[in-house]
From Swiss-Prot:
Organism, as annotated: Homo sapiens
Location within or outside the cell: Mitochondrion inner membrane
Impact when changing N238S: In D2L2AD; disease phenotype may include decreased activity of mitochondrial respiratory chain complex V
High-level lineage: Eukaryota, Metazoa, Chordata, Craniata, Vertebrata
Topological category with respect to the lipid bilayer: Multi-pass membrane protein
Propeptide residues according to the Swiss-Prot or TrEMBL record: 1-13
The protein's name in its UniProt record: Tricarboxylate transport protein, mitochondrial
UniProt effect for mutating R282C: In D2L2AD; abolishes citrate transport
């Protein structure tokens, strides 16, 4: 006589007691790099506007009256493609940045999960912090320094950099490798807090959505919404650090003795509001940025799980 079947409700609940599936760091590196490259091609114009507004210091007569005026002046002077000036430097950095970030996050989280393979919010924050520090030191600081110098140079009356690689050669020739690591402290603080906030929020929302089933599938729409929320939280949490980082990496960084001096000078000469200059364009870019990255990352990991067996 055949054994009776388990009730449907119990069968459906079975996965809840299973162990959460882990993501191999190698998969995370590939998926993260692809996601980072696609995302930056979509969102770069808002990054360009944000950087222009932050470099438009109050100590000089303002060049732009706001976001719209910055876009109008750029398009009038250089055409629509002017909003993509400096894209190459950011694109070259975005792919390895996302690869390092997700690879490090998965590496750390795989060692910090509980016996069931679950990651709580606090550990998600710590893993995000580690991922942010890693991407800051390995990729973000040198690439962001070059990007800001390149954009700043292109808006000067007589640009001296003919392209990305020429700009890198000139910066290294004139300032040495140290010239590509300006604002390292601010960058580590910014990226560390950035990813700590994002992964804390993302981990919290995912745990809430999945409940007792850590392997519950998430469709791209849900992932995108959660990513946008995480992005918004990070913007309001560390925009002042982003402003300081941008100033420390600009062509006039020599005006500041160090990161702390930069912050004090901005506060003294321009007031507290200067720390939130460029917040609106950054908010739109980051929300879209984080949503796109997490959606593409998750979907690529799903694909890799089918063709790359690591269990």
């Amino acid at each position: 006589m055949p054994a009776p079947r388990a009730p449907r409700a119990l069968a459906a609940a079975a996965p809840a007691s299973g162990k959460a599936k882990l993501t191999h760091p190698g998969k995370a590196i590939l998926a993260g790099g692809l996601a980072g490259g696609i995302e930056i091609c979509i969102t770069f114009p808002t990054e360009y506007v944000k950087t222009q507004l932050q470099l438009d210091e109050r100590s000089h007569p303002p060049r732009y009256r706001g976001i719209g005026d910055c876009v109008r002046q750029t398009v009038r002077s250089h055409g629509v493609l002017g909003l993509y000036r400096g894209l190459s430097s950011l694109l070259y950095g975005s792919i390895p940045k996302a690869a390092v970030r997700f690879g490090m996050f998965e590496f750390l989280s795989n060692h910090m999960r509980d016996a069931q393979g679950r990651l709580d919010s606090t550990r998600g924050l710590l893993c995000g912090l580690g991922a942010g520090v890693a991407e800051a030191v390995v990729v973000v600081c040198p690439m962001e320094t070059i990007k800001v110098k390149f954009i700043h140079d292109q808006t000067s009356p007589n640009p001296k950099y003919r392209g990305f690689f020429h700009g890198v050669r000139e910066i290294v020739r004139e300032q040495g490798l140290k010239g590509t690591y300006q604002g390292l402290t601010a960058t580590v603080l910014k990226q560390g807090s950035n990813q700590a906030i994002r992964f804390f929020v993302m981990t919290s929302l995912r745990n809430w959505y999945r409940g007792d089933n850590p392997n519950k599938p998430m469709n791209p729409l849900i992932t995108g919404v959660f990513g946008a929320i995480a992005g918004a939280a990070s913007v309001f949490g560390n925009t002042p650090l982003d402003v300081i980082k941008t100033r420390m990496q600009g062509l006039e960084a020599h005006k500041y003795r160090n990161t702390w001096d930069c912050g004090l000078q901005i506060l003294k000469k321009e007031g507290l509001k200067a720390f939130y200059k460029g917040t609106v364009p950054r908010l739109g870019r980051v929300c879209l940025d984080v949503a796109i990255v997490f959606v593409i990352y998750d979907e690529v990991v799903k694909l890799l799980n089918k063709v790359w067996k690591t269990d």
